[in-house]
């Protein structure tokens, strides 16, 4: 049997706030958004133009068995990586738009990397070719 990686699902505390972060700061397109009767929660699917990989944001109400509490600020998920043309410029742009700084740009091997942090504490890697 063969498997194909399809998406990453991460739990968020405020679905609207997280959608706004990924849409407005990272340019992701918002796809389906649905309530789930079985969990009491709601999810939204996002993707970047030109990519088949999906990001699923999941929100569950406190008091349900699906809610993770106390919330650990993204500790369960290490980071999400986005390729870009210029990691330095992307970092400056996202911080100027309100993203929390993670690590300022640095060079690692043949890549230029920088990190910002989303509203739920998940680190976002910005990666470009080193100059």
Short names for language-model regions:
Residues 9-54, 96:
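Core segments of cupin and vicinal oxygen chelate
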Residues 71-75:
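Short glycine/proline- and charge-enriched loop/turn segments
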Residues 1, 31, 42-45, 82, ...:
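Vicinal oxygen chelate
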Residues 59-64, 128-131:
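Acetyl-CoA-dependent GNAT
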Residues 1-17, 77-82, 127-131:
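N-terminal beta-strand motif that seeds the catalytic metal site of vicinal oxygen chelate
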Residues 32, 66-70:
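Short, P/G- and charge-enriched loop/turn segments at secondary-structure junctions
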Residues 21, 88-93:
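Short amphipathic alpha-helices within nucleic acid-binding modules
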Residues 50-54, 62-64, 87-88:
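Short, charged/polar surface micro-motifs in flexible loops or helix N-caps
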């Amino acid at each position: 049997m063969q498997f194909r990686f399809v998406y990453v699902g991460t739990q968020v505390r405020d679905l609207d706030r997280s959608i706004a972060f990924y849409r407005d700061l990272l340019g992701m397109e918002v796809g389906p958004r649905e309530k789930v009767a079985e969990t009491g929660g709601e999810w939204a699917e996002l993707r970047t133009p030109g990519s088949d990989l999906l990001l699923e944001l999941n929100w569950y109400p406190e008091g349900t068995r699906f809610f993770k509490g106390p919330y650990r600020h993204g500790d369960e998920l290490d980071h999400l990586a986005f390729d870009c043309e210029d990691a330095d410029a992307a970092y400056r742009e996202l911080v100027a738009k309100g993203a929390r700084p993670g690590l300022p740009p640095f060079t690692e091997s043949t890549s230029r990397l920088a990190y910002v942090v989303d509203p739920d504490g998940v680190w976002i890697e910005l990666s470009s070719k080193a100059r």
